[in-house]
Amino acid sequence: MDSWSYGRSVFMSNETLLPCDTFAKNRRFEQRLSNNDDVLISDMAGNSNGFSAVSITKVVPEEEDEENISSSSKFSSQELNRIDFKLRSFLDLGNDDDDTSSRGFALPSKKSRASNLCSQNPLCQVYGCSKDLSSSKDYHKRHRVCEAHSKTSVVIVNGLEQRFCQQCSRFHFLSEFDDGKRSCRRRLAGHNERRRKPAFYFLPGKRHKLLRTSQDVVGNKFLENSSLVLPESFPGSLLYRVIDEDDHRTSRLVSFKDEPTCSMFPTNEQNSSRTYESKPAIYSTEVSSIWDLHETAASRSTRALSLLSAQSQQHLSKFPNTTFSITQPNQNLNHSSSTDYHQMEQPLWIDPGKTNSAGSSSCKGKGTSTVDLLQLSSHLQRIEQQRNYTGDVKQEYNELYFPGS
């Protein structure tokens, strides 16, 4: 305290500020601030009552100001990133804790399951067997059946009579198997369908067209499952298949054109009766479709008819007691789209010993019907007449079986 602050008048309190006091205080404040050059007293004004208002501003260089601002901004961004990182790590830790807690329930079950599999040796599941399969193949281990019971026709599994299917690799009821089969009926049907491909014959002249045999070709049967006959071996004519009736085996295919004598009538050395099955010329150089195939066979029928009539008289006189059969085409012709050109009926048995004065022989079948050679020739003539009925049908089936040709 200054000396003049003591001994004031009674009428004046110690708290009363005099102008001299304010001036002295202001001087001391200036001296205190003079030690700090950064502080500037910008405004000091006196009031009527002796008080003054002083505004103090701090003078800071611009470089330091920018560094402080950048440091404060960096600090704030670092703090924010740190806080954000802490929050994220906290959330991740929480999720990891949840995952580990959920995994903690799942992992022991897998370990226990694996330990159970390792601890227990695979055994055959057939009742009464219980064979240890640890030294068996992996296939038998996987399906829990021993090698012997995998091929057994009847076993008991789960109290029921079953059998092991080799394609399904599991046990089925006995009703699902055919007799003597090791695979179930359902799998075996699909297996046979894939394995049994339909047979095809190739007809030259139609740009590698394949023609299906047997029932698939307009329902006819004159293309049967026989061996391929090349056009070099048998150039177009009527073919006859010689069949031994004793053992029903096919011996050869002969032609009217090549061997008229040997193919039609047997010799003395041939003791067994033979069946001569009529076959059309399957392969020829001029054949281009199934209809051209028939026309080629029909055009050669007159030659076969002449050979038949010329040789019959000569050979029937030589062998009076020989019995043979010739398969003839059926005379009942159906002109609908579902029938073929000629169908084969039962072979006719011709007994050359029973001949009439006109030179024709009577033909007796396995029934009681008889047919002479004139009726036989009429059958061959009808083959030639069939071309009159092939106008619209030929065009329809050529479009059906040979499209775009």
UniProtKB/Swiss-Prot annotation:
It comes from the Eukaryota. Binds 2 Zn(2+) ions per subunit. The keyword Repeat does not apply. Zn(2+) 2 binds at C165, C168, H172, C184. Induction: Negatively regulated by microRNAs miR156 and miR157. The keyword DNA-binding applies. Its main location: nucleus. Keywords: DNA-binding, Metal-binding, Nucleus, Transcription, Transcription regulation, Zinc, Zinc-finger. This is Squamosa promoter-binding-like protein 6. It comes from Arabidopsis thaliana (Mouse-ear cress).
